[in-house]
Amino acid sequence: MFYLCIRLITKHMDEITKIETVDQYDQLFGLETLHPLVNVIDFSKATRSVEYIRMNIGFYCLFLKDAKCGDLTYGRKNYDYQEGTVVCMAPGQVSGIDNRNRPAPRTKSIGVLFHPDLIRGTSLGQHIKNYTFFSYEVNEALHLSDQEREIVTDCIHKIRIELEHPIDKHSKQLIVRNIELLLDYCMRFYERQFITRNQANKDIIVKFEQLLDEYFQNQVAITEGLPSVKYFADKACLSPNYFGDLIKKETGKTAQEYIQCRIIELAKERILEGVQTVSQVAYELGFQYPQHFSRLF
């Protein structure tokens, strides 16, 4: 019997195993490798179970949890992977499987693994950074409607069909295009998720504005310098990419642009007051050099 649950892993825990290739991952679960650089995996067909492992992966992963996975540990909070949840990970990220002290039901989860070498030199390779959800935290997973789940499942199925087809000159292009289509759908569904969580998002915007004002009112900029997107994302308990995408969706500006606009507003206010010199204003707003401040205008 096999049970899969991806967990956020804290740094103080034990050894990390490097899983560099798709085949190494397949071997963990006794699954067939259809291609050295890409595979569609069906965990219900796993012939081996993994009780516990922490791993640093060398490829992209997209998992569709098609059955309840149980509790996901994130910091000190627990989250449930409900049916129809998509979780994505990028090369270099650390994830884990922990089946200790819990029953192990067979999961219906499926996934796509693809190595960066597969997409190198392709359109997808050039634009992979646009799929920012690969850098979202695990508690920022995508929750699908029934119709969306059918679409994602169909995309994964088409990749599987192409992998099972005898290799010819069209194989790589079709595989990569189908992966790109899958990711485009996930991007669309994430945007829908942002919209359906509109009120929660607006609360985050209000908190962001409050923290941004406090950053300068409390003169944090003098010691810490210019505020970063990561600073505010951490305060909101979100990953920088998820936070940035949320701000962009709600305001039409990137989080960095939003911060810069606020700095410009404050700078104009303080300069027009005539109490401080330009250099003093620049210093209090976090600029190390006044000439960098001047470039804002």
What are these regions (language model features)?
Residues K249-Q288:
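Terminal helix-turn-helix DNA-binding modules in bacterial transcription factors
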Residues D71-T73, S95-A104:
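Short beta-strand His + acidic residue motifs that chelate non-heme Fe in jelly-roll/DSBH
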Residues R100-I167:
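A hydrophobic/aromatic-rich effector-binding and dimerization subdomain
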Residues K230, N241, T277-S279, P290-Q291:
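Residues within helix-turn-helix
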Residues M1-D80:
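Generic protein-terminus/edge-of-domain signal
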Residues R76-A90:
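Short acidic-glycine-tyrosine-enriched beta hairpin
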Residues G84, F243, H292-F293, F297:
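Short hydrophobic/aromatic patch on the recognition helix
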Residues P166-Q173, M187-Y231, K249-T254:
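Short, Lys/Arg-enriched, Trp-marked, Pro/Gly-tolerant hinge/linker segments that flank
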